[in-house]
């Protein structure tokens, strides 16, 4: 596929939906069998990272509930469409996955570190969802200045806020 297509966004939406369906089915299977923890083992990125290493990838496409899925889907369409139109399908998917995986790993490591400090009331946390990938797309849009002539270019700041 050549540049200028929104197809990668549609593909990701389909992947999100398929993974969510698998999560629901795995949850049902875990509830009626002795497979408690199946969904977490397949999709939730949690410390220690080496225990279920595939979750570095699968957690990017999984979601906690339907609201989480829908909010990430809307953000993906808003921020992903301009990026998808500016790059190739392969680069778009690779960028999204790397941003999402890196964000998840950093969040898990950061909360694990903070939980070890006596002055911080923090617990090591588990993560899942496409927010890291979506924010990576937003960062790309802001850093590449693609928004300046369209959305962000039409917003004027008061003199006190401008640099």
PLM feature segments, named:
Residues 1-163:
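A detector for small-residue-rich transmembrane helices and their helix-helix packing motifs
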């Amino acid at each position: 596929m050549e540049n200028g297509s929104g197809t990668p966004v549609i593909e990701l939406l389909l992947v999100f939906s398929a993974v969510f369906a698998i999560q629901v089915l795995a949850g049902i299977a875990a509830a009626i069998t002795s497979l408690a923890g199946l969904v977490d083992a397949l999709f939730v990125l949690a410390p220690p990272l080496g225990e279920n290493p595939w979750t570095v990838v699968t957690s990017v496409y999984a979601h906690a509930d339907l609201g989480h899925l829908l909010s990430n889907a809307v953000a993906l369409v808003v921020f992903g469409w301009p990026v998808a139109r500016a790059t190739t399908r392969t680069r778009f998917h690779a960028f999204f996955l790397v941003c999402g995986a890196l964000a998840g790993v950093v969040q898990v490591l950061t909360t694990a570190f903070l939980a070890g400090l006596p002055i911080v009331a923090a617990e090591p946390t588990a993560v899942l969802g496409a927010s890291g990938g979506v924010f990576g797309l937003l960062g790309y849009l802001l850093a590449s200045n693609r928004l300046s002539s369209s959305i962000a270019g039409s917003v004027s700041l008061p003199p006190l806020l401008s640099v």
